[in-house]
Amino acid sequence: MISIQEQDLNIKQKDKKSIKCVVWDLDNTLWHGVLLEDQEVSLRENIINLIHTLDNRGILQSIASKNDYATTITKLEEFGLTKYFLYPQINWSSKASSLQEIAKSLNIGMDAIAFIDDQLFELEEVKFTCPEILCINADEIGDILDMPIMNPRFITEDSRIRRLMYISDIERQNAEKEFIGTTDEFLATLNMNFTISSAQEEDLQRAEELTLRTNQLNTTGYTYSYDELNSFRQSENHKLLIASLEDKYGSYGKIGLILIECQPQSWTIKLLLMSCRVMSRGVGTIMLNHVMSLAQKNDVRLLAEFVPNDRNRMMYISYKFAGFKEVEKNGNSVIFENDLTRIQAVPAYVKFQVID
């Protein structure tokens, strides 16, 4: 048996901030018995409460099970659990390949996944193929809710409805696959409403959560606590802006954050981040151009810090696409500057609102 204590987790695993998705095996894990062999299977004790609690904490869940798809879905429907599992991988592929597919579909890093299985072979195969993933033996299911990595500091409104927001994303993706036309033509059908506002005290829990959860679309990787963000919010030398997005399928929630350090002659973007769920919606460009417009109106230079890592290449491209140029390198960090000569208009298909 592999225990949490016995795993020789690499540094990334030890330092990871939170689990975004728990992936369940089924036979002798989620339920007692083997579905295709036993006359009946029964849910593991307290499993429904565990699933509900993880869901309420904003931790997504999925399945990686070697089973017959139709039979398995029917059984999950009998138990009333189907709706809790996003992109379930029920097939005869390796567990590692199923986990890779789930990470790709959810657009999250492999190190944001925990995998639960009762079979030592399956756990070892995943550990070898995907060492970033946290592997948990089914015998330790009772301890999961007490693990720090499964306990976000705050449970926000966005946390509580995260699964529902992902379900809306699936509807959008299906609609996009079926749409005949250009990307812009499809985006125009969404009736997007994008709002940027000065962060209020009630936004800070979600703002902290964004800095902790967002790795791919984060320009510096900086994380800030609730108290630090509250200090920035009240500071005359900083602007803390938060962005939200909704469309005809529903709300994406609060999906973007910008921290600007304001000096008399120059502003510096210390942090720009957005949820991976809105990567293809063009809102990063709108956020940047809004800040550029503010800097122009205040007659200040606009700088931006960027700290590259193995995930945030897209944010580097976003800066370059918006006309930012490298003016300085300091160790691993890059300083960009924008001359504010080509501020792009908000696309006609987005209703844009600014709330001071």
Question: Can you say where each PLM-predicted feature lies in the sequence?
Answer:
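Substrate-recognition element of Asp-dependent hydrolases with the DxDx(T/V) motif
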Residues: 47-77, 88-93, 206, 220-224, ...
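Short, contiguous acidic/charged loop-to-helix segments that flank catalytic cores in large enzymes
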Residues: 35-45, 90-92, 199, 217-221, ...
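Conserved Lys-Pro-Asp/Glu-containing loop-to-beta segment of HAD-superfamily phosphomonoesterases
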Residues: 99-120, 126
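Terminal substrate-recognition subdomain of acyl/acetyltransferases
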Residues: 105, 127, 133-190, 293-356
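Short amphipathic alpha-helix that is part of the acyltransferase structural core
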Residues: 191-223
